[in-house]
Amino acid sequence: MSDEKAELVSHEVAFKGYFQVGRYVFRHTLHKGGMSDVVSREVFERGQAGGVLMYDPGRDEVVLIRQFRAGAYAAGRHPWTWEIVAGIIEEKETAEIMIRRETVEEAGLSVGELIPIQNVMLTPGACSESCQIFLGRIDSSKAGGVFGLAEEHEDILVKVLPFAEAYALVERNEIDNAVGVIALQWLALHRDEVRKRWR
């Protein structure tokens, strides 16, 4: 809305390690009119990301990956998670270029046509990261194995699943990361249309 405005008072880096935390001081308009007091918030900053649900329309199969996740471990959840291939968009790189790089690194696959699904904020109350989600056409007959970059300590299992089986994982809450859930739910809504397009 045009009357919703924010004013940055100051910004500093509060922590810099594997990731970065910024401290933002700002004011913003209020729904009942006027401006808020000056507010200070720490924001987790890790750059912008992209992810791709790899799909073989002929076989009606998706390719998912499974790896250990420190965030899930710290939250007391099962730390090996089913996910779609994803990564951080590097400087001077588009989301599409990153997706093509990551599918090779994480799954040993080359992805064909990409269909944009959604560009979402993951946790806008505390993190600046957004994720551009795509559907990517692949040949699932060539998928499977363990991949990842040793220098990044990646140990990534690549698994081919019939779409119905993958979606059942969502319904049983066995896929509990938002990007994977969004991608699979989108495909559930648009699968017939995608299979016609990619005949």
Predicted feature residues:
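Catalytic-loop region of hydrolases
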Residues: 1-14, 23
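Active-site-adjacent beta-strand/loop module that shapes the phosphate/pyrophosphate-binding cleft
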Residues: 26-31, 123-144
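Conserved Nudix-box catalytic region and its N-terminal flanking loop in Nudix hydrolases
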Residues: 41-44, 61-101, 143, 147-152, ...
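A mid-sequence, solvent-exposed acidic-amphipathic segment
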Residues: 104, 110-122, 127
